[in-house]
Amino acid sequence: MSPAAAAADGGERRRPPLGVREGRGRTRGCGGPAGAAALGLALLGLALYLVPAAAALAWLAVGASAAWWGLSREPRGPRGLSSFVRESRRHPRPALTASPLPAKSPVNGSLCEPRSPLGGPDPAELLLMGSYLGKPGPPEPALPQDPRDRPGRRPPSRSPPSSSTAQRVHHVYPALPTPLLRPSRRPPHRDCGPLSSRFVITPRRRYPIQQAQYSLLGALPTVCWNGGHKKAVLSARNSRMVCSPVTVRIAPPDSKLFRSPMPEQILSTTLSSPSSNAPDPCAKETVLNALKEKKKRTVAEEDQLHLDGQENKRRRHDSSGSGHSAFEPLVANGVPAAFVPKPGSLKRSLASQSSDDHLNKRSRTSSVSSLTSTCTGGIPSSSRNAITSSYSSTRGVSQLWKRSGPTSSPFSSPASSRSQTPERPAKKTREEEPCHQSSSSAPLVTDKESPGEKVTDPATGKQQSLWTSPPTPGSSGQRKRKIQLLPSRRGDQLTLPPPPELGYSITAEDLDMERRASLQWFNKVLEDKTDDASTPATDTSPATSPPFTLTLPTVGPAASPASLPAPSSNPLLESLKKMQESPAPSSSEPPEAATVAAPSPPKTPSLLAPLVSPLTGPLASTSSDSKPTTTFLGLASASSATPLTDTKAPGVSQAQLCVSTPAATAPSPTPASTLFGMLSPPASSSSLATPGPACASPMFKPIFPATPKSESDNPLPTSSSAATTTPASTALPTTATATAHTFKPIFESVEPFAAMPLSPPFSLKQTTAPATTAATSAPLLTGLGTATSTVATGTTASASKPVFGFGVTTAASTASTIASTSQSILFGGAPPVTASSSAPALASIFQFGKPLAPAASVAGTSFSQSLASSAQTAASNSSGGFSGFGGTLTTSTSAPATTSQPTLTFSNTVTPTFNIPFSASAKPALPTYPGANSQPTFGATDGATKPALAPSFGSSFTFGNSVASAPSAAPAPAAFGGAAQPAFGGLKASASTFGTPASTQPAFGSTTSVFSFGSATTSGFGAAAATTQTTHSGSSSSLFGSSTPSPFTFGGSAAPAGGGGFGLSATPGTGSTSGTFSFGSGQSGTTGTTTSFGGSLSQNTLGAPSQSSPFAFSVGSTPESKPVFGGTSTPTFGQSAPAPGVGTTGSSLSFGAPSTPAQGFVGVGPFGSGAPSFSIGAGSKTPGARQRLQARRQHTRKK
């Protein structure tokens, strides 16, 4: 309490004058104890006040603790309090002095202490409010004074004074609407309890007020602001620390939007005339260019600001790393010296931008003119450069930044650079039209090209001017002048420019410097973004290539050949298409349809090998294409992976991309589907897989989303078929090939591989792409299955976030889509899509089980889940949601998923339920998934699936079969992989194995072990870990599971044990933790056995990913049981019996046993495929990478 109280008090203290005075008054009125307490609190508050973060936390604590304490306290000291209150009511002044103490006990306790519950708080609050209001702005001094006066005034009539004070406050801040509200509140405040509570809140409000000068924020009830705004507040605080008050930061976006356009326009007009005035034609051109650039920049900045608000952008910034942040600081902070040093911190740069924006705007106008005069900075400098101009040395750099800007500005969001760049140009063009549309566009291009050309081609007047600003004499000289010019510029902009000519010598130096700086900067950026930026910008091909290449390796085996051809079209198809939004799309699209269909055949035929490969290829390609987009997992992976291992820089950028992509692109989504597929192959490659993780979350997200997108698009259907085929074959085969070891590798390897493909691999499914899969889907399932599985894996990984949906259906959830999709769904589910839209979901989705799609719809999601629905929703929602394997979970996931996204949902099927188990049936099963009886089997043949239920997972199989039952549980969320990062694989890999029990490792589950698919752990799939963390929450990234990752839970939810099932059950944890999952579970999974999914851990672990892979879904291979999903033994997925068979080997992963059923997961088949290894997880790239990504993501969210 004391800390909270202190924090609260700190808030008051912040209001200092009032607080202090109040404290004094309190001391007098309240008495020694009250005064001492008030002083102590004030001191604490002051200390806290110094630390923004601490203050924020303190405020929260204070609010909760104050209310609680005050309430509990109230009874304790009603006498003193009531008496004080009464007195305060009776005597306004006395109330003020005395009230503080009483207030303390009744409401806030220590916090409130200073104020009386009624009168005390009222006046005090008013004062505080006044101080708050006053504090934010210049009025602040006045306000505090007014409050000071007010205390005296108030005393005369307790009630009237408060109202009058309220009115006064209003008058003081007529613009503030809240004050009006406050008066009404004040009467309640008088009531002590409400007052104190509100009072506590008030300090919070005050914070917001400080945040935004806009009194509005302060005025608004802080309760909402505290929660909702709080993030902003925190960021604001950060900015405040940097330099300007929070106010500036908050205001900038809005003001920027409003102000910047006008000033810019004005500038443009003014600049144009000045340009004409400019004696040198070059100068004129320069000016025009500068204006254009500036507008562009402004637009970009605005976009950035908006985006910045969004996590995606933040992620991009993070991914871009120093490049972007450095950029912003120089540019954003006009002043910047301080900021410049901080280029590293995005937040700061943003904050500084905000604060500087106002300055910049002022300087901008002048600066812009000066800029115009300065050709130099012109474009690159843009208004910001004006400030930068002050640093002549920096200027080159800033220009470089700017230059990248168009390409890079996008830097902030690589993906955005892709999609946005075109958009920005359009926007810029629109804005610039008056100034010079054509020119602006040219400049843009130029800028993009410029990095190389400009340096090489100083000859080009325009570029040069833009770049080096040779025309501008010394860039430093002129720029400095610019600052001087700011004021003078308006008067004589032209005149000044000539003098700068002296700077020409400087210009030469500057040019060199600029070149160097630009080269360095570009190198830096390029390193990060080379592949990213150039490829994306340039063409898909390049990107594709690499991925492709990687893919090949991955596919290695069969795939490679196929992959080449297919790849580009297929994965690309969607991913690119969507993703690229631009270049890729065109090529992509056509291919898409064709591809889809074509792929299908190839896929089908080769199904396995080829399929994979093509998929992979495409995936990769997509990914690269997408790259920017992220596209899908693959991409992501690629990217991610790349970064991880390969390119690293590119990778990074890719990762960024991924992140951004998702947001940025829809395309991304497409990729997603691909993703899956991609992934898979990679899986085989192993390396691929990893990458996925790397991107991991980011990727995932996109991926899924992508999928959806694609789904949505034509692709959906198309995809389906293609995907379908692909998936099955691909995934499986791939998997198979890779098979176990791949898996492992994947997880583990992956890393090493890094290969871009890596990521893709994950994809797993690619399929997904197929989502389509579904189409096939179901059948696929089996086949798909594999694919799916793969997909799943991939997905998982990838998408993870997204959804996964294993089964999703989820998508279906989207069901609707679903259906179709549903198929699509496929494992992979887009879910995200789904999330996305529904439809997409579809795609994504994956649906394990599809069929059901409908179910899907059902909820799809669910693995079977019925839940689905929820899940579905979730799924969709979630988008991510993996939904549990079991879908459902989905749901739950959903929600969480959502967040988490995870949804996974494996199942779909809806059926619900997921049933469990995988096995569904199992109901009884429990056993197994596979239903033990075979049936269930994953695939169960469907047979039986008995439960059939559908889901058939594959039919049959249903993943989960029926049963579902519920377990659903939504929890699901867990998601496959729980995010955890691990995602499927959770990093850790280790883990667990799907089944692993181990949990340990988690395998699936990420990290933490947790997860274990199977684990018995219960955790099960998820578990454990899940629990581990779970929580789904996660957000996580996780990928797979995201979220929570943990939880994964594959399954789910339910926990219940039941569930088992795939999971499920888990439920429980799912979400949360629970974890459970257990894939398999055996029932119950939870523990059930064990085994669960996979029992045996095998480490394999499903997940493992990371590491090892393991996971393999089925992994098979290994047979060794190990894995297998079912691992053998272990029980196998399918439980035992069969199981163990299951796959036992069968490699299979079999989900289901294969053997048994052949179906079995592996099995056979299809799913099985054996080899396949499914790898669900894939991996993730490294946990470290994933964690980093997650951390980034989370930060952005926090922001």
From Swiss-Prot:
Ranges of Basic and acidic residues composition bias in the record: 10-25, 298-312, 424-435, 446-456
Segments for region (Cisternal side): 1-56
Transmembrane region(s): 57-77
Annotated site, Cleavage, chain positions: 531-532
Modified residues (Phosphoserine): 83, 244, 319, 322, 325, 345, 355, 367, 370, 408-409, 412-413, 416-417
Region span, Disordered: 1-29, 82-197, 294-328, 344-509, 528-631, 701-734, 1061-1151, 1163-1199
Protein name: Nuclear envelope pore membrane protein POM 121
Organism: Rattus norvegicus
